[in-house]
Amino acid sequence: MIYKRSSQLFADAQKVIPGGVNSPVRAFKAVGGEPIFIEKAEGAYIYDEDGNKLIDYINSWGPLILGHAHKPVIDAVIEKAKKGTSFGTPTEIETKIAELAVKMVPNIDKIRMVNSGTEACMSAVRLARGFTGKEKIIKFAGCYHGHSDSFLIQAGSGAVTFGTPNSPGVTQGTAKNTLLADYNDLDNVRKVIEANKEEIACIILEPVAGNMGCIPPAEGFLEGLRKLCDETGILLIFDEVMTGFRLAAGGVQERAGVKADIVCFGKVIGGGLPVGAFAARNEIMDYLAPVGPVYQAGTLSGNPLAMAAGLAMLTELDSKRGIFESLEKKTKYLHEGMEKVLTENKVDFTINRIGSMISVHFGTEPVTDFASAAKSANLGVFNKFFHGMLENGIYIAPSAYETWFISDALSYEDLDTTIAAVDKVAKTL
């Protein structure tokens, strides 16, 4: 494929934007080469500035679960935009999307809208600290909760890719209150709690890790965390920015049957526009300003265009619950097809999948945590695989540590085309 215009646009962008991108993973530094610039997208496909058509497995890093330019979402945004783009006042549509989210998600009474997943997680931790009166938090190595200072301590994806799991600019004062534990290791979590008795406000985690590849929770892990939190008074925060409204209408809480105290959302809830949210039971949410002492605010929080997109998206997912079964079947079909051709081509690999989230690791050991993800990354093989897939019209995440997100817009013909491309590329690895 030819990427002449993308190359020129990247050169232009680097003159006025740091690294030429507004989020590091987009720069292709992890895989080499130059990023492609997208002109438009529809359904399962993206079209770059050079006219190349690609089957998309990123879907804007997860929000576009029904595919690009989904008509009900686009129509809702257009109609709302005709009435104005932002008011800085309450609007009816904020209440409507809140009512629908509370209906769909178990164990929440109220929800606060913000502008990103980072903001949601940052606010949730502040709320947990305010509610409990304690300062320390536990996060898991390799789990990513956005670029807030408290979370850039052995974060996943971009931080790992660039070899800088601790970002300059994060102070020791901030870092000392973030305690690290190993994902899928309850004994390790118990030890961390024991060493910091009566000091921990919350445990925050991706209930399905998505930033060290896709790593589902081990059997009993989430249940064990719930039990530990009940025993110690620590709040359990599920960062469902990736999994919320994707793995089930009610997210991981519904799918796994495990209750969180606070839940964070992003991606799908905005329908492709910038939206984050955090939610909990009344007792916790009523600690938020203006009714409680914990301050949180935002000029564009609850923006009417974003709320229109989110409401249209959630309405589709709520009214057509068969979408989740369809996504499960399509992702399983892709999983089994890739597994077959990679095995036939004698490639060392493991594939992790849950629902419509999937990742390929080029190693033979099971990938269950940060250490095993790093061991199985095999960046040289992955980078060759990435560029081979791109050359064959398939756009996957440009990082060995990122999850692929399946949209329901994908047809089985698209999946067969993808499996054939994997077969072709595997012969070169």
Curated annotation (Swiss-Prot):
Signal peptide: none annotated. GO terms for biological process: protoporphyrinogen IX biosynthetic process. Pfam families: Aminotran_3. Keywords: Cytoplasm, Isomerase, Porphyrin biosynthesis, Pyridoxal phosphate. It is an enzyme of class 5 (isomerase). Its cofactor is pyridoxal 5'-phosphate. The keyword Isomerase applies. The keyword Cytoplasm applies. It is found in: Cytoplasm. Pathway: Porphyrin-containing compound metabolism; protoporphyrin-IX biosynthesis; 5-aminolevulinate from L-glutamyl-tRNA(Glu): step 2/2. This is Glutamate-1-semialdehyde 2,1-aminomutase. It comes from Christiangramia forsetii (strain DSM 17595 / CGMCC 1.15422 / KT0803). The lineage of its organism: Bacteria, Pseudomonadati, Bacteroidota, Flavobacteriia, Flavobacteriales. The gene is hemL.
